[in-house]
Curated annotation (Swiss-Prot):
One cellular component term from this protein's GO annotations in UniProt: cytoplasm
Species of the source: Streptococcus pyogenes serotype M49 (strain NZ131)
Domain of life, source organism: Bacteria
Any single biological process term in GO: methylation
Protein name: Ribosomal protein L11 methyltransferase
Organism phylogeny: Bacteria, Bacillati, Bacillota, Bacilli, Lactobacillales
Entry-linked Pfam families: PrmA (PF06325)
Keywords assigned by UniProt, alphabetized: Cytoplasm, Methyltransferase, S-adenosyl-L-methionine, Transferase
Primary localization: cytoplasm
Amino acid sequence: METWQEVAVHVHRDAQEAVSHVLIETGSQGVAIADSADYIGQKDRFGELYPDVEQSDMIAITAYYPSSTNLADVIATINEQLAELASFGLQVGQVTVDSQELAEEDWADNWKKYYEPARITHDLTIVPSWTDYDASAGEKVIKLDPGMAFGTGTHPTTKMSLFALEQVLRGGETVIDVGTGSGVLSIASSLLGAKTIYAYDLDDVAVRVAQENIDLNQGTDNIHVAAGDLLKGVSQEADVIVANILADILVLLTDDAYRLVKKEGYLILSGIISEKLDMVLEAAFSAGFFLETHMVQGEWNALVFKKTDDISGVIGG
């Protein structure tokens, strides 16, 4: 019987997506994320509130490696990468790393216990792919397989991106999703009525995972996934461009975004920690955008900019 090695990394919630990516890059075959915020005030599939859930800023990200993996080398690499993330200003908290060995059948089912359907916005609910879920009238369901990396749609940066998409999409738009990760924002855009979505990611794993998640959802053949370095080489104009990535990378795409966003179109930027907010604002303003909406959850910020000559309805207009 094949065995697997489990590594649990305990970090601050703000580092969820970055650390998940690190674990996949070190060879993990999947990750599971245990976050108390996903359970407080939520009901399980039987309609019962989760009992005795204590709020914490720390989460556990569990990764699974084949038995042939040299775990000592992996853990050393993880610690190096986490230290580098902290040096970039990302809050990782007091990191601890644990490991154990699992049988094949334990690995196959162990991580699924962490995930339940989650209502993210007024219209959008994210549902694990293996769960039978009866949607209510008007509810739009995004099916995701969170067995791979890039989060499950419950991180504050993703939630705010989804809120922003609900705010700006009215139907028939062209959307560009930069750094698509799991593909959740592209799937949401399709469900919210966008006509065509182009999803780009520099990471080949993300491109594959996004396509797999898109294939789980009906009516999403209007999403086109491809490898791409931000907006370099992209000529397709869009009504909406959305990017949920680190602030240091967001500032690199604002000029290209202004070139591609149609007049009266929108640029949605998320993944911005508060200490880097001014840097992102300055880059977007310099490119020519006007700020329409600023959302905040904890230390995270999301911004909705508009490309317009009519500044009467925008912040600072």
